[in-house]
Design a protein with these regions (language model features):
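N-terminal "arm"/small-domain region of PLP-dependent enzymes with the aminotransferase-like
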Residues: 1-81, 96-97, 441-462, 468
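Conserved PLP-enzyme active-site core in the AAT-like
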Residues: 2, 7, 11, 77, ...
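Conserved C-terminal alpha-helix-loop-beta "cap" of PLP-dependent enzymes
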Residues: 2-19, 23-24, 376-493
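Short charge-dense sequence patches
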Residues: 26-42, 57-66, 201-203, 266-273, ...
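Short secondary-structure transition/capping segments
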Residues: 36-38, 43-52, 126, 151-152, ...
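Short N-terminal helix-initiation segments at or just after the protein's N-terminus
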Residues: 40-44, 70-76, 230, 288-290, ...
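Structural motif of enzymes handling amino- and sulfur-group chemistry
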Residues: 60-61, 333-419
Length: 496
């Protein structure tokens, strides 16, 4: 395959050969044994399998314990406020009495509740409403945590324009809150080079150091002090997400820095931890965050439900917004009839959350043990399947906090050389992310694989009904991923 002078030429050639790549992927699936495994799963009525845990558009099968509790409670007549209270006291048992909980129907709903009740300026009262601005690092998944304000500076006005299935007011634009701006803040040590078939800036963050960014956020906060209302970030803990620089306790230093800056100005620091586990992952006590939002149907293996956990004082805002904080006549708990009542999770979501959180709190090894086995399979298969000169640019990071293994290949581009193709998140939404669509061509469910970072996790029929890893099936999935990388590299001109 021809070598290319410019990376734009490489991505153009990939696009021109996309059908050939997917055809070779389908053939590889047969040779590896993926196709045969898919036949077995379909005969069992279990659909397909994949490289990820449950996602919004494809929830994971429920474990036996979650399913059993949900089925039992489905036949019980109880007020939903009682379930909310049980969740509340699990959180207090683990984090301490100064913390509280607020269940919601999805993680995105939780972010909406937090930003509306904690970042957005008040809209009641005579006269004009003032503007407020929250700080968001320019990092991965920015369209979630960074999508609720008008971007500042204006050069970022289209930063999330191509990140959604629906354009305009009912798509990403519709998340923007009244009189709220988002301060897009580049990270020191990050690489925002353009990549992908859609050729947008990628967020490559393995070089980010926590303390090196303190001055960046201090300056941003000081510059906008009169309108500064909060800080947000994601809650992951791996190098590819910019949080590989940690203290002696394993806490990402950048998250502690963000908390310090927020508290200096007496504004909240809210963490989007969609793919993290409460009790196991991001520890709000160590980072200093004020509130953290989870998607329990992802890594936590619950039915569809979101969860806000935070410090009691700021959680009054969220719980009142959801109608959980008690009736006006003095009750200690209630359910619904507040501004964000449309975000309530319902009985099925609450029961799944309770069952999943019990395991995370009391038997976390059920969730973490499969991660060890998955990591070993990934490292073993990549050593066998990826050319040594390319493998030098990979890093593999295991994270219990997300039940995942991060496969980062940013450094295959070191020293000015052409590396393994990097696809942007715009490629994902545009259907041109070959590292995701190619897995689909093999018949499997892909995982997020953009910005030089592939996040493999357990869940989509790679665990049995008790939550134990099915190693043979996970190995097939990883071999499929490696085959896809090699096929793509051939058409990228970086290997024969």
């Amino acid at each position: 395959m021809a070598k290319f002078k410019y990376k734009t030429q490489m991505y153009q050639n990939l696009y021109a050969n996309i059908k050939n790549i997917y055809s070779e992927c389908a053939q590889a699936a047969k040779e590896i044994g993926i196709a045969d495994e898919l036949v077995k799963l379909k005969e069992e009525g279990r659909g397909t399998f994949g490289l990820t845990g449950g996602v919004s558009g494809c929830p994971a099968p429920l474990r036996d314990d979650v399913l059993a509790f949900s089925e039992k409670e489905a036949k019980s007549v109880k007020g939903l406020a009682g379930y909310v209270e049980e969740i509340r006291y699990m959180v207090k048992d683990f984090y301490g009495s100064d913390y509280d909980a607020c269940p919601v129907n999805t993680c995105e709903a939780g972010i909406n509740v937090c930003y509306t009740s904690m970042f957005m300026p008040p809209v009641m009262g005579a006269g004009d409403t003032y503007r407020a601005r929250y700080i968001a690092p320019y990092e991965k998944h920015f369209h979630h945590q960074g999508g609720y304000g008008r971007p500042f500076p204006p050069k970022y006005k289209d930063i999330i324009a191509n990140r959604g299935c629906t354009a305009g007011e009912l798509g990403m634009q519709g998340k923007r809150q009244p009189m709220l701006d988002v301060l897009v803040t580049k990270l020191e040590g990050a690489d925002y080079s353009n990549h992908g078939i859609q050729y947008f800036p990628a967020t490559m963050l393995s070089g980010v150091k926590g303390e090196a960014n303190r001055a960046v956020f201090e300056e941003q906060a000081a510059r906008h002090a009169t309108m500064f209302s909060g800080i947000t970030s994601i809650g992951y803990d791996t190098p590819g997400y910019g949080y590989g620089d940690k203290d002696a306790d394993g806490t990402p230093i950048l998250q502690k820095v963000l908390a310090d800056v927020a508290h200096k100005y007496d504004v909240p620091y809210v963490v989007d931890a969609a793919w993290c586990l409460p009790f196991v992952g991001h520890d709000i006590r160590k980072t200093g965050a004020d509130a953290i939002v989870y998607s329990l149907d992802k890594a936590s293996a619950s039915s569809i439900c979101g969860m806000i956990i935070g410090k009691e004082d700021i959680m009054v805002n969220a719980r009142r917004a959801m109608g959980f904080h008690g009736n006006r006549y003095g009750s200690l708990s209630s359910y619904g009839k507040a501004v964000s009542v449309a975000f309530d999770p319902g009985k099925e979501g609450l029961c799944g959350a309770i069952a999943a959180m019990r395991v995370l709190k009391d038997k976390p090894e059920i969730m973490t043990k499969p991660v060890d086995a998955m990591y070993d399979i990934i490292v073993e298969e990549f050593k066998k399947g990826i050319a040594p000169e390319l493998l030098k640019g990979f890093t593999f990071t295991k994270t219990y906090g997300s039940c995942a293994c991060e496969i980062n290949y940013e450094h295959t581009w070191d020293n000015g050389q052409m590396g393994i193709p990097i696809f942007s998140i715009e490629d994902m939404y545009g259907g041109t992310n070959i590292f995701q669509e190619g897995i689909g061509a093999m018949g499997m469910i892909p995982t997020i694989a953009y910005d030089g970072n592939i996040y493999v996790s357990t869940g989509l029929n790679t665990l049995d009904d008790t939550g134990a890893l099915i190693p043979e099936r996970m190995r097939l999935a990883i071999r499929g991923l490696i085959a896809l990388i090699n096929i793509t590299c051939k058409y990228a001109g970086i290997m024969d």
